[in-house]
Design a protein with these regions (language model features):
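Transmembrane beta-barrel wall of Gram-negative outer-membrane proteins
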Residues: 266-370, 395, 405-412, 419, ...
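Short, acidic Ser/Thr/Gly-rich low-complexity loop/linker segments typical of extracellular
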Residues: 57-68
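Gram-negative outer-membrane beta-barrel transporters
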Residues: 745-747, 765-858
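Outer-membrane beta-barrel signature, preferentially recognizing the C-terminal barrel domain
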Residues: 390-409, 593, 597-606, 660, ...
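N-terminal periplasmic accessory domains that precede
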Residues: 104-107, 157-160, 177-180, 192, ...
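Short, acidic, small-residue-rich periplasmic hinge/interaction motif at the N-terminus
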Residues: 25-32, 38-45, 50-55, 84-88, ...
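Short acidic/polar hinge/loop motifs at secondary-structure boundaries
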Residues: 72, 197-225
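Extracytoplasmic beta-strand/coil segments of soluble accessory domains associated
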Residues: 158-197
Length: 858
């Protein structure tokens, strides 16, 4: 905080210096005027990304995400101002700038542009907004508006993101959860709300679960693939910014309702949405409120396999699982926004959003273990085993595992105009949490089995041997099913963020060689805690209830499970029986291994930046910037030790507090060349970073001498740094549409992955397996992006209601300087989590409110 106050003092000193400069030219400055306003269409919908240009001064600005624009430092007089927007008729108007005052001038554009008898109507409004924002942006940005999102059956932000060029997603239960930008892992990109990074409720990563936020709760999704100096620098892949619904230009109201059906759960889904906005007190006060509710019962069929390399160097299957999931996800989201125009030069904004997701899950799993042990042991016994497991919870949680995730973000900001100087400030508080109360597992195990695996080398192998809880009793004690696990855990993860920032913008000169300077400072304080407490009641259950579970079975692995008929129904302990057990009356043993992942971390990041924008004639714009980010982190965790004795005695000891500090300097240089009004070329160089996971930094030592395994944290981890080059060309059609191509290169240094070593010696003890996160080396990432979007009205006017949208991204990665012990000379390694191909295609029909789309995502 002290560092932030010093930065603010420095910026105030710069302001006072600037003030002295103004004083020297006080006559001219006093007479300078300002234009401020908002761009809307005839239905009073805001138009972000509109171009506002004064030909006489060769000066232009672009409306922001809420449609506002500001022209400062204008000599009094009368000017012709031109406002243009793709798909709208341009407007030219005479404006007289008053001396020393601010003129408020809103502009209304007429919907529909007649071009060779092709009329672009309101059905394509969302495309126009997105295309205008991309067209007028200095960097490389992809934009999706709310009404575009609404035309696809996307329930959450993650599903909406997968349709953007260069983005692929990781799924959970059929829904997009984490987003990956330009072939980088989800850890290497950031997710922000209104420019502030979202806290994460994930325990092991900084990732944000995108399926937590309903798609209908945002106004715009911006994917900034080039990060400029006025943005947070921790975004190697890119920055995904979610712009929440802002106050309207006039009263508006909307309500939506929808449904669906899931064939696995055999239940209907429900989607509801409500939005209301208005302005009060002679339009000085604006308000927007929105509510979203979704209830989605679903399910999934899942088979998973684990492989290893044997002593002969052969890849062999060691484990196979078949899983049946039944999941219900209920999302509630509430947002509220106010803005107040104190006068034409000063505006305050208050925004808040709260998201809440209940995730009730039951899982029924069969595990076939030790599949690589195909022969008999020295005693003539088969060496494979099976486990049957039920995952659930208590009756108050529907006898299911409840994962309750919540996020909230509350921000207060101000925009002020002091003569030539613009001042924007903001303060925000955000919190994310995940609660898993009374999560229960009931697992049964049978040993001395032998399985037959079919198609072991293919993508979908399967076990033909029948596994049943009713088998094995005739084989005596050795063949019986035994209670392996009966556990209940309670977990809480929460992260709190507090941020303050102040930015200044000073226009220096106007004209074809006009320029401006931006500078500012930011302070972000983050705390994160993970607390898990787990007890095992298996021994007490066996002594008390013996085989009572056999009277409470349910048949799962449903009919129609996966393609084919090779998967047979299996009996499991029912979720109702598992939930009914009174574990509070049983004596349980704490599972210290689960608590060994607990930690506390506090991170403070102080940053400052400057950004210089320069026009190099009428067609070329340049932006040069530098950002400094100083990071200080303090953390502690736990060491877990399992003794190699008869009782396998466990201990848990605190690691103590550890600290780490570092400073990063992040330069950026961007160019944009307007070949003409429709063809735009962009080039940029930027430097970005990605900070290590909190859980990876904890200097814990977890020793399991029973299994002879060692897991360690690594407090010496350094941030991953990336040097980024981008080139792109975009052509924008007069009617709504574009064609674009781009190439990008990233030189990524010190990427982090887990190192796994066999037969590892630590403190004179040898361990079968050693795992530790490590800065593994460097990587080159090269990619190509292509996109095409257009309606078919250019072929024939009657086809204007039909269009096509398609994207394709290719990425290739190559690891260099790989420093894992014993693997230094390995070649042809790719960056973890990097897909080679991603693609989207959509053929659509839109006419008179009727919308049909056929979409494909790869």
């Amino acid at each position: 905080m002290k560092r932030f106050l010093r930065l603010v003092s420095l910026t105030l000193l710069i302001m006072s210096t600037s003030g002295n400069t103004f004083a020297e030219e006080k006559v001219n400055v006093a007479r300078q005027g300002t234009i401020r306003g908002r761009i809307v269409d005839t239905s009073k919908q805001i138009l972000p990304g509109a171009s506002i240009y004064i030909e006489k001064l060769h000066t232009g600005v672009t409306s922001d995400v809420n449609g506002y624009y500001t022209f400062a430092n204008l000599t009094p007089g009368t000017y012709t101002v031109k406002v243009s927007y793709v798909g709208y008729s341009p407007v030219e108007m005479k404006i007289t700038i008053p001396a020393g005052k601010t003129l408020e001038k809103d502009v209304v554009l007429n919907e529909g542009l007649e071009l060779q008898e092709v009329v672009v109507g309101g059905a394509f409004q969302g495309q126009r907004r997105a295309i205008n924002s991309q067209k007028n942006n200095l960097g490389i940005t992809n934009v999706v508006s709310a009404d575009q999102v609404g035309k696809f059956p996307d329930s959450n932000i993650g599903d909406a993101l997968k349709r953007i060029n260069g983005i692929n997603v990781q799924y959970d239960q059929g829904e997009a959860r984490f987003g990956q930008v330009r072939g980088t892992s989800a850890d290497l990109s950031s997710v922000t709300i209104n420019g502030n990074r979202l806290p994460s409720a994930e325990g092991d990563t900084r990732n944000v679960q995108l399926d937590l936020i309903p798609a209908d709760m945002v106004q715009t999704i911006e994917v900034n693939k080039v990060v400029t100096s006025d943005m947070d620098g921790d975004a190697i892949g890119g920055s995904i910014n979610l712009v929440t619904k802002s106050t309207p230009y006039k009263r508006m109201f909307s309500a939506t309702a929808g449904t669906g059906y899931n064939w696995i759960s055999q239940k209907a889904q429900l989607n509801l949405g409500f939005t209301y906005g208005d302005r009060f007190f002679n339009d000085k006060l604006g308000m927007m409120a929105a509510i979203s509710y979704q209830n989605a019962p679903s399910g999934s069929d899942d088979v998973e396999f684990e492989y290893d390399v044997n002593k002969k160097g052969e890849v062999v299957m060691v484990e196979a699982q078949k899983r049946q999931y039944y999941v219900t996800r209920e999302r509630q989201s509430y947002s509220l926004a106010f803005d107040y125009d104190i006068n034409p030069n000063h505006r305050l904004t208050l925004q808040g959003i709260y998201n809440r997701r209940h995730d009730w899950e039951n899982r029924y799993r069969v595990t076939y273990k030790d599949l690589d042990k195909t022969g008999l042991d020295d005693e003539g016994d088969m060496q494979q085993s099976a486990q049957i497991e039920t995952k659930g919870g208590t009756p108050d949680n529907r006898n299911a595992r409840l994962e309750l995730q919540q996020t909230m973000d509350l921000s207060l900001s101000g925009e002020h105009q002091f003569g030539k100087l613009s001042v924007n400030w903001g303060a925000s508080y955000a919190r994310a949490s995940e609660d898993r109360p009374n999560e229960r597992y009931f697992s049964l195990k049978q040993d001395f089995l032998g399985f037959t695996v079919v198609d072991a080398g293919d993508r979908f192998p399967y076990v033909t041997t029948d596994v049943s809880l009713h088998n094995g009793e005739a084989d005596g004690e050795r063949g019986k099913w035994k209670v392996k696990e009966l556990t209940e855990s309670n977990q809480e993860i929460y992260e709190k963020d507090l941020k303050f920032k102040v930015d200044f913008e000073l226009p220096l000169t106007n004209g074809i060689y006009g320029n401006s300077l931006r500078f500012g400072a930011k302070y972000a304080s983050k705390t994160k805690d993970r607390n898990t407490l787990c007890y095992d009641y298996a021994d007490t259950y066996k002594d008390t209830f013996d085989k009572d579970y056999m009277n409470n079975l349910t048949s799962q692995i449903r009919d129609g499970y996966m393609p084919g008929d090779q998967y047979k129904p299996t009996d499991f302990v029912s979720k109702e029986y598992l939930g009914s057990l009174d574990l509070s009356s049983m004596e349980g043993e704490q599972v210290l291994e689960e608590s060994s992942g607990n930690y506390h971390a506090r991170e403070n990041v102080t940053s400052a930046f400057f950004r210089f924008d320069q026009n190099l004639g009428k067609k070329i714009k340049m932006m040069a910037g530098l950002r400094m980010e100083a990071t200080h982190i303090k953390y502690n965790g736990w060491n877990w030790n399992v003794a190699d004795d008869k009782d396998e005695t466990e201990t848990l000891e605190p690691t103590g507090n550890h600290k780490n500090s570092y400073v990063n300097w992040l330069p950026s240089l961007l160019f944009k060349y307007d070949v003409n009004d429709d063809l735009k070329l962009r080039a940029s160089f930027t430097e970005t970073l990605s900070r290590p996971k909190y859980s990876a930094l904890i200097p814990c030592v977890n020793i399991n001498r029973s299994d002879n395994e060692l897991v360690m944290g690594n407090s010496d981890l350094t941030p991953t740094i990336s040097y980024n080059l981008d080139l792109s060309a975009d052509y924008y059609f007069k009617s709504v549409g574009l064609i674009s191509a781009g190439i990008f290169y990233k030189k990524i240094n010190d990427f982090i992955v887990d190192q796994v070593i066999g037969d590892y010696t630590y403190q004179n003890n040898e361990y079968k397996k050693f795992t530790q996160p490590k800065n593994a080396g460097d990587a080159d990432l090269l990619g190509v992006e292509l996109a095409y979007q257009r309606d078919f009205g250019f072929i024939a006017p009657a086809l204007k209601c039909i269009g096509f949208y398609g994207t394709y991204t290719y990425t290739h990665t190559q690891v260099n300087n790989f420093n894992f012990e014993g693997r230094e000379n390995e070649k042809d390694l790719s960056l973890p989590g990097s897909p080679e191909h991603t693609a989207n295609a959509s053929l659509y029909f839109e006419k008179k409110g009727f919308n049909v789309r056929f979409s494909y995502n790869y």
